[in-house]
């Protein structure tokens, strides 16, 4: 692929009673419609961005390639590709009327489903990148569910900024096989793409809570909630 493609798998989501889009790895989608964006993550990460004033939002789904370089080095190919994946999402939201200074982020994924395939855990690598990138861009992370050993199913409402997550079985062979193939593909040349780089989380199956000051993470199909992990404000 020569660029980060827009997700095209549109469907009607019977659970949320609205139109939805399923994102595959290395895809993104932005909209101001009252719809749901859904993806399944293993070691990949997804950033969900929302402008609460313009009521527009979007999601991406990506994995950093392992180029053998120091993963924290800004000049490495993997960092350039990660920056590209984030900038595509940010720029599309800005073109649609969003303002960078108003963006809020919710981030997911980075599980250890491909441990041992690279010199460091690829899930940790992805999670560390998305945190650092958003900190450098001064985009506030209002909630996150990163790392661990469980694949995740994530649903995001771009119109409201509401997000929900469901932990999947640790041994989810379809997720592991898909991401193993993605990791092998990511190990190949990413030059063309790299050159172009320059408030609440709930679980599926629960009633939507009223707005609260502290973002919450809730799981699909349960009523249990837990505080979201939040970054310290500067």
Swiss-Prot record:
Q: Do you know which Pfam families this protein is assigned to?
A: CheD
Tell me which domain of life the UniProt entry assigns to the organism this sequence originates from: Bacteria
Polar residues: bias regions: 223-234
Q: Which GO terms describe its biological process?
A: chemotaxis
Using the UniProt annotation, give all residue ranges assigned to the region (Disordered). 183-234
Q: What is its EC number?
A: 3.5.1.44
Keywords, A to Z, come to: Chemotaxis, Hydrolase
One annotated GO molecular function:
protein-glutamine glutaminase activity
Q: Where is the composition biased (Basic and acidic residues)?
A: 190-201
Keyword field contains S-adenosyl-L-methionine: no
Q: Which reaction does it catalyse?
A: L-glutaminyl-[protein] + H2O = L-glutamyl-[protein] + NH4(+)
Question: Which protein family is named in the record?
Answer: Belongs to the CheD family.
Q: Matching HAMAP family, A to Z?
A: CheD
Q: What does this protein do?
A: Probably deamidates glutamine residues to glutamate on methyl-accepting chemotaxis receptors (MCPs), playing an important role in chemotaxis.
Full protein name: Probable chemoreceptor glutamine deamidase CheD 1
